[in-house]
Amino acid sequence: MALTLARPEGNGPGGGNLALFYLETRDANGALNGIRIERLKDKLGTRKVPTAELLLDGVPAEVVIGTRDGTRHIAPMLQITRAWNSVTAAAFMRRGCALARAYAHERSAFGAMLAELPLHRETLADLETETRAATLLAFELVELIGREEAGDIDDANRALLRLLTPIAKLLTAKQAVATVSEAIEAFGGAGYVEDTGLPALLRDTQVLPIWEGTTNVLALDAVLRTDAASGLAAMRARVAAALNGAPAAVAGAADLAVRALEHAEAWLAATKDRNALQTGARRFAFTLGRALELALLVEHARWALVRDPVCDAVQTARRFAATTIDFIRDGDHGG
């Protein structure tokens, strides 16, 4: 079965006049049910998931709900697929890190194992930090979706879910491309050889900022949404909860997360020009996402220290805090 958007006869142009339909892709004999494959697309990656141009001619289909507003009705599915995208991004990052770390303990250079070279260790630590941040953000989104599906979510968390969905998807996807690329570079020339499987990992990762809404589309979704204020209030509350009781060792990181979030909120409140909002949408979304990631790393450090006083969670939070968290440009409010 499949769900598809189509324009019922008599409906005018525009996305609002599309309807959501249910159809069965094969008939009782197992043949395609009025669906003709025009061509398979020759893609950069994800070749195990074929993409095709299809012609639907005489396919039996049933309207799911109403004959208009199909895009709005299909939105819950987009929420799930964007969460999948975020989790996949974290998974690809973890695989890249694991491979690079394992290789560092097998490959020697300059008379020592790569894992013993200070600069290589620093590089691997940076990759690990981004991976942990992305993982925490992805599963923050997963938790909110789980609460919504279980009927155990209040209005504030529902607003946070709506805002976090595009932000988590766009940020983790960007982090994945950068992290996997760097992890492959850690193999040197071997990372560029097809039979290692590493180039395929990079190609598959590259689709993540494209699938389920590009970075620009999702950034605009975050900044222009009518309920942005309630979403920001909920995010502020979530950050405050994450930072409550933060260990002294990560107090600076906690303060940075708060200041970045406040800066983004102030920019949104001061920016009335729609063109300026669109111009700054990426910086706004990246700031919200990385501020929340930093807060989640601080929260994790607090939790981890109770269980293992010598864990590296504090160092991870502090390392992440040393990266760019606040992307907002002062004075970029338009006229």
Can you name each region flagged by the protein language model?
Residues R162-R238, R307, R319-G335:
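Alpha-helix capping/hinge segments and adjacent helical runs
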Residues R238-G335:
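C-terminal amphipathic alpha-helical interaction region
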Residues R132-K169, E185, E265-A281, E299-C311:
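C-terminal helix-coil-helix/basic helical segment that borders enzyme active sites and/or dimer interfaces
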Residues H120-T131, A138, R147-D154, N244-A253:
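N-terminal leader/propeptide and maturation segments of large enzyme subunits in energy/redox metabolism
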Residues M1-G34:
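A short core secondary-structure module
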Residues G45-K48, R82-N85, E116, H120-A133, ...:
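Secondary-structure capping and boundary motifs in well-ordered enzyme cores
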Residues R26-G34, E38, K43, P50-T81, ...:
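A glycine-rich, basic-preceded beta-loop-alpha segment at the flavin cofactor/substrate interface
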Residues L5-P8, F21-E24, L55-V63, M77-I80, ...:
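Generic, well-ordered alpha-helical scaffold segments in large soluble proteins
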